[in-house]
Amino acid sequence: MFLKAVTMQGFKSFANRTKIELDKTTTAIVGPNGSGKSNITDAITWVLGETSVKNLRGNKMEDVIFSGTDTKKPLGMAEVTIVFDNSDKSLNLPYNEVSVTRRMYRSLESEFLINNKKCRLKDIKELFMDTGIGKDGYSVIGQGKIESVLSSKPEDRRNIFEEAAGISKYKYKK
């Protein structure tokens, strides 16, 4: 399984629909300061269920919605879709591609979709549990994440290792 594409519209600095296509060999996103690298990682963790405004580098949740510039009006909605190659069936779905979408409106109402079918945030979290992918997974390592892990409490580090080892789903279902 690997991330094939990230499509953002109205998410933070990405006012216009922006699609980033990736392949198996992609290991990092690089670019100059201010080019949107951190917003791309925020988009990925957000669509996977991040609910902490602090982790999304904002003051309030609606900060993920494009707030406008001198030349562009603010938008009323943010939408992010990520597409995974699932030809190895790492995800327990009978599809070779799996898309996950999250939309949020200024009213703070959210919609979640798996392969364009409405679902709950819980369904997304369960789908990616023990894959190493998810808002708490370590497939996306943002600025400060490594330092955060190293300075975390032993119980928190244990949770990280349980997720990586694929046993956290058993604790979750208890």
List PLM regions with ranges.
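Gly/Lys-enriched N-terminal cap/neck module of very large, oligomeric protein machines
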Residues: F2-K174
